Amino acid sequence: MMDGAQTNSGGCPVMHGGGSRPMGATANQHWWPNQLNLKPLSANSEKLDPMGEGFDYAEEFQKLDMAAVKADIANCLKDSQDWWPADYGHYGPLMIRLAWHSAGTYRTYDGRGGAGTGTQRFAPLNSWPDNGNLDKARRILWPIKEKYGKSLSWADLLILVGNVALEDMGFETFGFAGGRADVWEPEEDIYWGPETEWLATSDMENTRYGEGRDLHNPLAAVQMGLIYVNPQGPDGNPDPLASAFDIRDTFARMAMNDEETVALVAGGHTFGKAHGAGDPDLVGAEPEGADVAEMGLGWKNGFESGKGVHSTTSGVEGPWTPTPTQWDMSYFDVLFGHEWELTKSPAGAHQWRPVDHENDQAPQVDGNGTVPIMMTTADMAMRMDPAYEKISRDFHANPDKFADAFARAWYKLTHRDMGPIQRYLGNDVPSEELLWQDPVPMPQGPQVNDDEQAELKAAVAATGLTAAELVRVAWGSAASYRDSDKRGGANGARIRLQPARGWTVNNPEELDKVLPVLDSIADAFNGRGGTQITMADMIVLAGGVGVEMAAREAGHNIHVPFTPGRGDATQEQTDVDSYDVLEPTSDGFRNYHATFSLREPAEMLVDKAALLGLTAPEMTVLVGGLRAIGATHGGARHGVLTETPGALNNAFFKNVLSMDTVWNQTDSAILEGKDRASGQVKWTATIVDLVFGSNSQLRAVAEVYASADAEAKMVDDFVAAWVKVMENDRFDLHR
């Protein structure tokens, strides 16, 4: 009785119940769920990276004998393992799905997701229902990863194996680029949706949909835990036309048009099969929820052998074509060669079978006998939706056109988040530069030297443009950058072009004033026939002039580092619709927040800082410095907490922390700061400004810069962070 009655409070915390609760299980977020989350600003710290300081993945990747790597992968694809046997003796279809699902989380709205960092290895992606049994695919690839180690990242391998699989089954791919460095923790800054239940349907609480099945931004997938759409139809409703709506919306949010969508669906489903052999209730927990003895594997299946012919993944069962490991036109042959009727799989999933289902058979996965072919509701959309059907029939009649479209769409799918072609590594990179890569011509000839830069800077300073104007335009050019998919930035000077020139956040009227002045300086300099300067460089150089002017106003003589080498894109090199997704709906650095923004302004500030690759101190010093300069959207005084706007000093920090001011909310989104003694209004500000006094972590950083001995440090740190933003997209300087 004595042993059994011992309580946790009196027991050993290691050997008894106290050890069953993870340390830190009750986090601050539990007690204060509305607390501003700053973790995205410290994600993937170098402290987590086992490769150590100085490791250069690009350099290691270039050492690979890619022909040998691909040969090893091809052999691996045909080396069936008893613990997870290959369907049809070839892992190719499984690896195509692996690559597709690694890349397919990408969405255009914020550039997040995708294959660029290898995060399919981590939660939540490794345990999404739609990624069922891909844990086995990664284990099958471990001998390849083990052999090539640091020279071949998981991120690159997950895409390369898809290409090799396609090629080994007879398809000619468009190309492959390496250069995706692994990260070492989940990307927790990605918002995957509001639901708290896997595969929650749109009629449940916390839905991701508004009126009329309007999917909330930035999401692209239709349900929590799916990569794209529900193969059975919207919310499991087997309606091909409703499915077509979902497919079109979701693929558009992943940067694909109708032709690319049909090519990907038909090309991908030329290979392999879906798995739904048994009762899904017999499938165990996902990897993150499985017992430790499973060693990171999940979805243990209690139906018969649980593998091979007895596998259950999506619940849909069967191959799409009679030749599931061969590139051919059989997908369209089957789709248009039969009339179809709705049925259910052994797992209870909606799917479609030919009315004459006995006449078109495929081999069983273990080679013993044959099984019927099938189509999903999503496949039926390729026939039932008028636009998709027209494209599908055109592809069916023109095999070479289909093959080229699939090759290009697959390449786009698997490389969309890598940024410009300058980041692509390896001998298999196609020479053709594509519009979706946001091409920027590299400047030719020698770049402006220090003396020429000084001459140009003097010309800018003599124009009468203010520091705030110069800084705002340079910030607008550079701050379009997204580290998520490496798009945007100052290189290319697309702030001169549509659509960026018309974005509200960029103050088009101010651009019309400032850009022609800078253009005339560049033209006069270039007209001498010697060294040339691009407008992309001119805008950044002029922004540096603005920072130096503001620093001098505060008594600091500084030099803002500048490295020339940016190119100028043309309007023809800019896909307006594709580039328009980069328009910020919120930029707290400029104190801009559109009424239709997704989240609260302070949250959007952190989100913007994360997309710019900034830390919390860098975000803090940039906001304080930009406010001191007066570089707010439209020159608004909200948040300009200084008596000397235009001077780069630490006044913002001193005043936002001052106990002499009492803040009150007005009827709008603006807060008033009144003198505690007199009651007179001293300042107006936004929530973004006041978060540096209200949030305990940001206040701690702000206190550093508000200190009496900190102004010089604040200016130096501002310049360093400024240059970082200006050079985020300089992949010729860093990767």
Curated annotation (Swiss-Prot):
Cofactor remark from the record: Binds 1 heme b (iron(II)-protoporphyrin IX) group per dimer.
Enzyme category, top tier: oxidoreductase
EC number: 1.11.1.21
Paired cysteines (S-S): none
Cofactor(s) annotated in UniProt: heme b
Modifications after synthesis and translation: Formation of the three residue Trp-Tyr-Met cross-link is important for the catalase, but not the peroxidase activity of the enzyme.
Entries under InterPro entries matching the protein: Catalase_peroxidase, Haem_peroxidase, Haem_peroxidase_sf, Peroxidases_AS, Peroxidases_heam-ligand_BS
Active site residues per record: H101 (proton acceptor)
Position of the Tryptophyl-tyrosyl-methioninium (Trp-Tyr) (with M-254) cross-link: W100-Y228
Bias (Polar residues): 1-10
TM stretches of this protein: none
GO BP annotations listed: cellular response to hydrogen peroxide; hydrogen peroxide catabolic process
Catalytic activity from the UniProt record: H2O2 + AH2 = A + 2 H2O; 2 H2O2 = O2 + 2 H2O
GO cellular component: cytosol
Keywords annotated in UniProt: Heme, Hydrogen peroxide, Iron, Metal-binding, Oxidoreductase, Peroxidase
Family classification: Belongs to the peroxidase family. Peroxidase/catalase subfamily.
Entry function: Bifunctional enzyme with both catalase and broad-spectrum peroxidase activity.
Complex and partners: Homodimer or homotetramer.
Protein name: Catalase-peroxidase
Underlying gene: katG
